């Protein structure tokens, strides 16, 4: 019997669909689709531990970020090309996503050892680059607009489609 057939008989195909429908980004939806059916008891146990820890966080931890999960993959992939740049909207999205990552890592660093150990271990591999967020903060205000203190050249580059109000 194939794994797809076993998955359908057990109803996990429907569970996958329910989870996929609740995903807030294209990346999360794709990751859900890529998850493979498993019969390995060790892997199933690990997945259940992660799921249960996240369920507990969602139910009881008010300080865990519930928003700010933005799909940045498309414009970050473009930035790997030499000479590419980022538009103002994408820069604002990146700022939000970096802040969410910072808040997630802060949440787990403030949690006592032994609480949510599996998720804490998973999050421990996240590397933050505060310089990037600080640099974005020198460019954008809290509303995602170019700050008045941004250089004239940067201001004009980011707003090339409209005349600079500084003129």
PLM feature segments, named:
Residues 1-146:
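Conserved amphipathic alpha-helical "coupling/scaffold" segments
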Residues 145-159:
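Charged, surface-exposed helical/loop "interaction arms" that form contiguous linear patches used
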Residues 160-167:
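Conserved small/polar residues in nucleotide/adenosyl-binding loops
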């Amino acid at each position: 019997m194939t794994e797809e057939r076993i998955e359908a008989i057990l109803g996990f195909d429907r569970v996958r669909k329910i989870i996929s429908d609740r995903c807030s980004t294209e990346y999360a939806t794709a990751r859900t689709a890529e998850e493979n059916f498993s019969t390995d008891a060790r892997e199933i146990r690990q997945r259940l531990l992660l799921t249960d820890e996240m369920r507990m966080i969602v139910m009881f931890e008010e300080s865990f970020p519930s928003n700010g999960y933005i799909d940045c993959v498309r414009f970050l992939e473009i930035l790997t090309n030499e000479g590419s740049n980022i538009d103002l909207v994408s820069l604002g999205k990146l700022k939000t996503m970096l802040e969410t990552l910072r808040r997630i890592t802060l949440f787990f660093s403030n949690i006592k050892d032994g609480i949510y150990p599996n998720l804490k271990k998973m999050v421990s591999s996240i590397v933050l680059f505060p310089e990037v967020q600080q640099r974005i903060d020198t460019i954008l205000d809290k509303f995602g607009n170019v700050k008045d203190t941004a250089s004239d050249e940067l201001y004009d580059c980011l707003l090339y489609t409209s005349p600079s109000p500084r003129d």
